[in-house]
């Protein structure tokens, strides 16, 4: 991501949030399918369950989940007030089944929830943490999850060599170009994506906000944190959906 997208502390800014609100539907590969995959993975939870969404954005994923599971409640956490306002408006029809809270993903205060958490989900957020921060996050999430709880992550992943990075960069360009044409009939969104340096695999800077980790490393960290049933459910253009459970479900 280009430098102007960050604030002075190299954090996600409200300007970045507005860009993502306007262009996120083009930039995320198979966005609609990803949401269905994540929602489907929650089907093993029966009865009333409480879900925690780390970096909920505008709440599109949460809408899919709340529609699919009428007995679920969901708390959306995000670092952007603009995102939280949008989510609260977008999900107002669910009443008190959806609540929102401003937070810092890397902080510890939110990791001591007052109510039982049956699932933690996160889309396009964990890559903002360093490797050690991801490991701590996985350990803390394992602790707060109820027995048989599940952690589901959809995120950007790093590649171990230049060949993998190049393939992911080209694939992501192709995905965004195709979505731009499919949704709008032109390549304007793709041109913005390219001009503003949103292809992380072409413009990744070690000092940038984006710190993706290899998928294999993250799967190992999940097991080391105590999770079982660690699995990968989807991959495309440097993006993946993977999950882990607090205990095995037959």
Report residues per predicted region.
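Class I SAM-dependent methyltransferase SAM/SAH-binding core
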Residues: 52, 59-108
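A short glycine-rich, Lys/Arg-flanked "PGG" loop and its adjoining helix->strand segment in the class I
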Residues: 135-147
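Conserved beta-strand signature within the Rossmann-like core of class I S-adenosyl-L-methionine
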Residues: 148-155
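A short acidic, Gly/Pro-enriched loop at the edge of an enzyme's catalytic core
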Residues: 111-120
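Conserved class I S-adenosyl-L-methionine
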Residues: 1-46, 60-64
